[in-house]
């Protein structure tokens, strides 16, 4: 399938000193049950895990039961790509953490990759026919507000082609009247673990081909496509496993008055722009308000070529350890998460709802645009399969920023 071709073909991106980057932790929502309880283990992508723990605690406060048994929920944070790989390899609790009954990665793209991996390894299927959505957040190009405004934001539609053009110009930001900003500097996350990294890579291929769907192996092998994506990669000066690597480092740079020199742009989820602008790059509700807001805030550029949506699916695994009681508990918790109260809670932290409808925080004042994105890209279909791994060579100027535990993915 084309999605797997992209993952296989961009392995070169992860050979720059990065580590596993699963960004997991074993924190859970506190149990409230005694006796014979139904314990539902949920593994969530890291950017929403802490919020999901709060919602799970609220849910348990209502005293839910299944067949007369109390329900308790344990939420574990693990980066989407790390969880996908762990499930595909059989999930070793000693190294991978608590085994999930429900998996909620940031994007359905990881679900399709797990399906392909298990089929290729001749393992039993783990994905149910339906994977409902609990929240959404589009991929954006986050840029310091003064830089984005120098390019015409918010009036001008910008995209990957504009970044490629800027990155190719030896005069850098001088062409836009700001020689003090130096060269254009792009940040990127590991597409094997980070949803924003995966979606940014796929988005660059779509931009190169000027397609919005039906990306084929022939498109990937086209020399013009390869040249475009290689050009984008040559602008990458910081390369790490997760979004948090960049946003935490950018916060430290901003604290030192260097918010415009660390990086020019990085692909992240829309909600991560809001998190950074609140002084809370981890997105953890418990740390909101504990750090000053940045001197130089970020804004979201929604690629004019179209973008991908992190759709946060709710995947009740079809695995032997997930019995009927757990499935009923998962369905009941899902109903709670999709109801108005929980949906509003997601929107309080700049997520969009499961239908991608923006909430009250998606405003220009917050660096976000509620009339964007204008176009959504259709992810590569899982039915397409290939062993093609042709990709542009690794840019030699790229450096790794290392692993940061607990980061979004």
Where in the sequence are the language-model features?
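Short helix-loop capping/hinge motifs at secondary-structure junctions, enriched
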Residues: 147-153, 207-215, 320-330
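A conserved helix-loop-strand patch within extracytoplasmic ligand-binding domains
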Residues: 118-193
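Short beta-strand->loop
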Residues: 43-45, 153, 167-175, 181-197, ...
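Extracellular/periplasmic juxtamembrane helices and adjacent flexible linkers that interface
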Residues: 1-21, 315-409
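Ligand-binding pocket segment of bilobal, Venus flytrap-like solute-binding proteins
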Residues: 203-300
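Early extracytoplasmic/lumenal segment of secretory-pathway proteins
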Residues: 9-120, 127-128
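Periplasmic-binding protein-like
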Residues: 128-141, 226-236, 240, 288-320
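Extracytoplasmic
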Residues: 37, 70, 97-99, 127-129, ...
């Amino acid at each position: 399938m084309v999605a797997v071709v992209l993952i296989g073909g961009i392995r070169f991106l992860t050979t720059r000193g990065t580590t596993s980057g699963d960004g997991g932790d074993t924190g859970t929502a506190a149990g409230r049950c005694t006796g014979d309880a139904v314990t539902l283990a949920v593994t969530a992508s890291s950017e929403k895990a802490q919020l999901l723990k709060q919602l799970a605690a609220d849910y348990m406060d209502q005293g839910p039961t299944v067949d007369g048994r109390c329900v308790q929920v344990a939420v574990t944070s693990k980066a989407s790509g790390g969880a996908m790989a762990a499930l595909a390899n059989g999930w070793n609790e000693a190294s991978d953490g608590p085994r999930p009954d429900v998996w909620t990665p940031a994007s359905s793209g990881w679900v399709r990759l797990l399906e392909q991996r298990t089929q290729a390894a001749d393992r039993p299927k783990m994905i149910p026919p339906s994977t409902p959505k609990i929240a959404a957040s589009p991929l954006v190009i986050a840029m310091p507000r003064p830089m984005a405004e120098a390019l015409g934001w918010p009036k001008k539609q910008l995209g990957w082609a504009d970044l490629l053009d800027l990155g190719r110009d030896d005069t850098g930001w001088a062409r836009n009247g700001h020689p003090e900003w130096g060269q254009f500097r792009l940040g990127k996350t590991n597409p094997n673990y980070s949803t924003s990294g995966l979606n940014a890579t796929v988005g660059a291929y779509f931009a190169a081909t000027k397609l919005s769907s039906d990306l084929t192996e022939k498109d990937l092998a086209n020399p013009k496509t390869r040249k475009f994506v290689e050009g984008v990669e040559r602008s990458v000066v910081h390369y790490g496993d997760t979004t948090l690597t960049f946003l935490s480092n950018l916060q430290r740079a901003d604290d030192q008055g260097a918010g415009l020199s660390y990086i020019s742009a990085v692909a992240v989820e829309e909600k991560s722009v809001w998190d950074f602008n609140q002084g809370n790059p981890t997105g953890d509700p418990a740390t909101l308000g504990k750090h000053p807001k940045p001197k130089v805030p970020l804004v979201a550029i929604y690629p004019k070529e179209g973008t991908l949506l992190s759709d946060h699916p709710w995947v009740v695994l079809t695995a032997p350890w997930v019995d009927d009681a757990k499935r009923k508990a998962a369905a009941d918790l899902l109903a709670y998460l999709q109801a108005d109260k929980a949906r509003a809670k997601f929107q309080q932290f700049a997520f969009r709802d499961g239908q991608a409808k923006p909430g009250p925080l998606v405003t220009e004042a917050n660096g976000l645009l509620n009339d964007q994105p204008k176009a959504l890209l259709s992810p590569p279909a899982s039915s397409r399969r290939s062993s093609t791994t042709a990709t542009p060579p690794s840019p030699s100027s790229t450096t790794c920023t290392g692993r940061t535990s607990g980061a979004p993915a």
